[in-house]
Amino acid sequence: MKLETRERTGLVVMLALLLVCASLLLTVLGMPELFVAAPEPEPEPIELAATPEPTPEPTPTPEPTPQLRERTELLTLVNPWHELPEDWETELQLVNDDGEGQYIDVRCADALLQMIADCAEAGNDPYICSGYRTMEKQQYLFNNKIARLVAAGTNPEEAPAIAAQSVAIPGTSEHQLGLAADIIDLNYPYLDEGQEETSTQKWLMENSWKYGFILRYPNGSSDITGIIYEPWHYRYVGLDTAKEIYDLGVTLEEYLDMFYEPID
């Protein structure tokens, strides 16, 4: 009897366990949502740093175009490419009474005489050997240069062009303006490059600008001026202009191109 009771008790326990398991199974099957994986939260959008707009470069301020100056008579350009103006007139003043006399434009005569006086006072021996020239005088000098070249063996057809390098063709000489003078040292009375070694020329090259004059045909500038180096030929351009040209170290042609309206 005790055995039967134990068997019944064990059977009851097993049935109870089966019922519990069945109940749990039904619960699980009836509530599947409890075992569904929770959805992963959507990632928050990453805010990208805004691409900075490039800082615009400031527009450079254009440099002002220099105002070109108006030419004056004292800056009249006469060279192999620019002839003496047809209506050119000049009032002359005597600056050397030796021989036939030498004259120059009244606008620069006093400055020239003062320059010569100061040069002499500094212990030099300056002498004005040529000033204003008429068309006839320039023609005579030009023809004479050609004749001397031919006599020395130069081809007559080539002589005029060669002569023009040292004696201006009539109508293209600054001496016809009345604003130029040839000044030599009496201790070396020759119109050649040896003049630059004289004390007179050394003084004039350093000081002529103070009187409004410039060395018109500097060494190494013949391709610009059209005339060979003449360390004796001085041209009046006025005090301010002479200082500018001296400071810049340029020829009159270069100076006019830099600051003045082009010639029509």
PLM features per residue range, with description:
Residues 2-264:
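Extracytoplasmic cell-surface/polysaccharide-interacting catalytic and binding patches
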